[in-house]
Every structure is written in C-alpha cells, then in structure tokens.
Amino acid sequence: MNRKGNVYYSGVLAGRIEEVPEGYRFAYDSDYLATLGTRAISMTLPKSTKPYMSKVLYPFFYGLLAEGVLKETQCRKLKLDENDHFGRLLKTANSDTIGAVTVVEELEA
C-alpha cells in the first residue's frame, strides 16, 4: 500500500504525491494542466505532463513541514515519527500552510 496525498493549489486539485518503492512521485492532475491560467505549485516543479520522481522528499514539500518545538508538539500529539517526513506531510499540511499549497491524505477505500 503506497501512501498518497492530493496536492491543492489555492483549493484546486493540482496533482498527487505518493510514496513509491523508488522514493517519491509527484504528478500534475490532467484537468489542472488543461485549465488556462493555472500555475506551477513551485518553481522547482514546473507544470509538466510527465511525473517527477525523487529518491528523497522534494525540498518544496519538505519546506511545508513544521520545525523545532512545533514539530515536536505535532509529532507527540499525532503520534508521528519525527523522521517520517512523508507521514508528517500527509498529517499536517492539509491546512494552515505557508503559501497556497496544501496536501490532503488520500485514504484507501
């Protein structure tokens, strides 16, 4: 079972990020790409029909994570491993993030 998250830009579904055996995969949503005026979620992840692959969590997404005391508090309250960056992203980046991007965990049906 791969962990997945829907990535929203200003409340609009922009793409999906998932944990895969090789690391992480981010792909823009085809409807988002087809909509005129939509922006890339990051300068480091320009709009593309090809998925992005990385062995480590993309720095852009890592930048959405809390640090210091807030990180410790979130991990303690949510019972998260401080070193599970992707798990932290899925559990904490769904609201009140810096900027226009949020990540909502995609739960298995």
Task: Enumerate the predicted regions with their spans.
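Phosphate/dinucleotide-binding and metal-coordinating scaffold of catalytic cores
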Residues: M1-A109
